[in-house]
């Protein structure tokens, strides 16, 4: 975390290692987006969204189950008008709150985020940003500047590394330092269902240049730039080889906008529904989740990798990974 808390760390160990329960509720808070990024599949599937009272009940269940972190994300949380009430309810239950956004509505809604602890904004480049996201970087910068002065912890900019933005990475890191915000990196994940033309356009083709870029990220981290990733993780990113035991589906309870529960961002087939009760779904699917993790070829989503390494008490990650 950006601010290490021995108490929260102890609660996390108790919840995950002793009780064998998740520590984080990752909630797809809506099914709509105000961007149309070619490499993303989420915005293409608008569907049913839980009513506010159902979300409150979900949060109540989660807290009763021992979950201490609420993460609101996907498709674009700031499109959900009741977001402030949802965050407030989570905070009143004693949960740490976090939010992932594309930032387009951040300037407009930043004042409403008084109950938010951690904010992550997707910033995938400087010169390449418009080509990647379809809007100009200038559209989101005022919101980032405004929000960083409202939330309690350092704001995070997350960059997905692709073939489009390799020339922007060092500038982006320097920009993060100048703005007094944190920055994280992860490689692009090739979701099924996205056109091959998109991957041909966005994918990493020049591996030598890619590795030089990641080497520079590692160097700049060691030089003290505000990069939250661990070196252990960044070395995996450099080789695009996930060398870890995944515990994402033990750490995180993943709930969709319609209330269905899925294994993780990669294995998205529903394994239950909150109407069953999350405790029942968790216990019933224990073997299924274990089998899925064992058979998975693994991804490099930084939240999954870093937290799985933390779960296994990796010392370097514990020392140098700085986020939820």
Regions found by a protein language model. Give the residues of each.
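Conserved alpha-helical substructure of the radical SAM core
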Residues: 1-112, 118, 312, 320-324
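Cys/His/Pro-rich metal-binding microdomains
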Residues: 34, 38-41, 247, 297-300
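Conserved residues at the C-terminal ends of beta-strands
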Residues: 43, 73, 122, 186, ...
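Short loop/turn motifs at secondary-structure junctions
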Residues: 36, 66-67, 115, 151, ...
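Processing junctions and N-termini across compartments
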Residues: 27, 31-34, 240, 290-293
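Flexible mid-to-C-terminal extensions adjoining Fe-S/redox cofactors in radical SAM and related proteins
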Residues: 8-16, 21, 243, 258-324
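Secreted/processed peptides and extracellular or luminal domains of membrane proteins
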Residues: 39, 43-46, 252, 270, ...
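Radical SAM enzyme [4Fe-4S]-AdoMet core and its adjacent flexible, acidic
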Residues: 28, 50, 93-96, 111, ...
């Amino acid at each position: 975390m950006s601010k290490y808390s021995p108490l929260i760390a102890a609660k996390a160990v108790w919840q995950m290692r002793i009780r064998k329960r998740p520590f984080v509720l990752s909630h797809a808070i809506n099914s709509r987006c105000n961007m149309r990024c070619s490499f993303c599949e989420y915005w293409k599937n608008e569907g049913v969204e839980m009513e506010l009272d159902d979300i409150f009940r979900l949060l109540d269940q989660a807290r009763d189950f021992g979950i201490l972190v609420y993460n609101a994300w996907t498709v674009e949380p700031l499109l959900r008008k009741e977001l402030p009430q949802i965050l407030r309810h989570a905070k009143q239950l004693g949960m740490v709150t976090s939010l992932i956004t594309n930032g387009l509505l951040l300037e407009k809604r930043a004042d409403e985020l008084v109950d938010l602890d951690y904010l992550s904004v997707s910033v995938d480049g400087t010169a390449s940003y418009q080509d990647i996201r379809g809007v100009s970087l200038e559209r989101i910068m005022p919101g980032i500047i405004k929000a960083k002065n409202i939330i309690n912890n350092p704001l995070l900019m997350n960059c997905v590394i692709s073939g489009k933005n390799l020339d922007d990475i060092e500038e982006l890191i320097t920009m993060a330092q100048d703005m007094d915000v944190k920055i994280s990196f992860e490689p692009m994940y090739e979701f099924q269902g996205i056109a091959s033309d998109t991957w041909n356009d966005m994918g990493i083709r020049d591996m030598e240049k890619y590795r030089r870029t990641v080497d520079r990220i590692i160097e700049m981290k060691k030089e003290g730039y505000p990069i939250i990733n661990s070196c252990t993780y960044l070395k995996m990113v450099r080789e695009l080889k996930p060398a870890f035991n995944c515990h994402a589906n033990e750490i995180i309870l993943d709930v969709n906008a319609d209330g269905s529960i899925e294994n993780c961002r990669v294995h998205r087939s529903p394994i239950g529904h909150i109407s069953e009760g999350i405790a029942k779904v968790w216990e019933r699917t224990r073997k299924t989740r274990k089998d899925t993790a064992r058979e998975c070829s693994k991804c490099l989503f930084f939240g999954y990798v870093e937290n799985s390494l933390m779960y296994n008490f990796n010392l370097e990650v514990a020392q140098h990974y700085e986020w939820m």
